[in-house]
């Protein structure tokens, strides 16, 4: 799906990757704005795929907010059902104080709380895209983000 581009909007593509046995992960965010393309990336040991997906989105939002002024609109495209599904779970997670049914703290509660705060403060629209799908766009940014994140993980675990 090619996003309709509004000059006041930032288009963001994110992805996270994790080597499940070695628990090393990486995240990538590609930010498009007025013809510019900015790529952010990072990595962490002892992590999970969900944490990397969430960090990609949070870091993209924070980058845009820290480098602009005034009203911003972010259109975020991700293949992570986990990230896209979080806003629908906000009320339940908040009322249970981010605890699971067994009374343990929700995994990644720190990031989930930060994510919810960012959603409250800014105009953010999340779009679920299918992973590894070809598009008619000149550059498939979702696939590019995936390749970059997987490349970081591969290089680190060799």
Where are these regions (language model features)?
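RNase H-like nuclease fold core
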Residues: 1-52, 62-64, 87, 140, ...
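RNase H catalytic domain
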Residues: 17-23, 58-143
